[in-house]
């Protein structure tokens, strides 16, 4: 039976292109999402075999969306589609339970191979990132340690996207006081004291696009 696929990318033209590519290879696309939170909701409702998540999506980045997908639909395998090939991004994704890490610079067939591999419960890395991950495990590179918790990273992304504390509280389902507490704590951890600094940090971490 053909794997059932959920696509998540904030660019409609990208989703349309990916759908055409996958359907041409006999794969079934059962849903599309334009942001990370919609992707999580659809994964919980549709229970796809594979969720393909763009790393830099609005409201919730692909990495944190993958964690939520795993929580709501444990059988769903996740693939991150990204421009980031540095070892610390790959390691962080693997630690989050992502099954596939596909670089956007690779040929289209790379994504199709990734889908088939993760459906066999294997881990798939694009060739362009494989060397970085091998070097990191051999001790030739030191992965960047993410100082923030998953929730703090979500708050960082929303702050960088221009959301108010009240809007952040609503999106996360917490009180305004709790949202403000998360913001204060992440600023203290990062030693950043203004919103502009948080935006720059979020861009460097790939949570939002410049």
Please place each PLM-identified region on the residue numbering:
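Recognition helix of helix-turn-helix DNA-binding domains
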Residues: 164-197
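Short, flexible helix-to-coil linker/hinge segments that flank and couple to helix-turn-helix
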Residues: 88-154, 196, 207-209
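Short hydrophobic/Thr-rich beta-strand motif most characteristic of the beta2 strand and flanking loop
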Residues: 26-34, 42, 192
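Active-site residues of response regulator receiver
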Residues: 54, 82
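Two-component/phosphorelay signaling modules centered on CheY-like receiver
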Residues: 12-31
């Amino acid at each position: 039976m053909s794997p059932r696929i959920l696509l998540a990318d904030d660019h409609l033209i990208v989703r349309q292109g990916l759908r055409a590519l996958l359907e041409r290879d006999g794969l079934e696309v059962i849903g599309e999402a334009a942001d990370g939170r919609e992707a999580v909701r659809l994964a919980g409702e549709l229970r796809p075999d594979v969720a393909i998540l763009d790393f830099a999506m609005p409201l919730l980045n692909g990495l944190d969306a993958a964690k939520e997908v795993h929580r709501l639909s444990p059988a769903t395998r996740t693939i991150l589609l990204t421009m980031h090939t540095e070892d610390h991004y790959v390691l962080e994704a693997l630690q989050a339970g992502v099954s596939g890490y596909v670089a956007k610079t690779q040929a289209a067939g790379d994504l199709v191979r990734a889908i088939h591999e993760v459906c066999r419960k294997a881990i798939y890395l694009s060739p362009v990132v494989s060397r970085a991950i091998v070097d990191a495990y051999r001790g030739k590179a030191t992965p960047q340690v993410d100082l923030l918790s998953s929730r703090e990273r979500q708050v960082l992304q929303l702050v960088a996207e221009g959301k108010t504390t009240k809007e952040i509280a609503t999106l996360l389902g917490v009180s305004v006081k709790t949202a403000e507490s998360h913001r204060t704590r992440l600023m203290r951890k990062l030693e950043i004291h203004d919103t502009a600094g948080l935006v720059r940090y979020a861009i460097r971490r790939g949570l939002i696009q410049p």
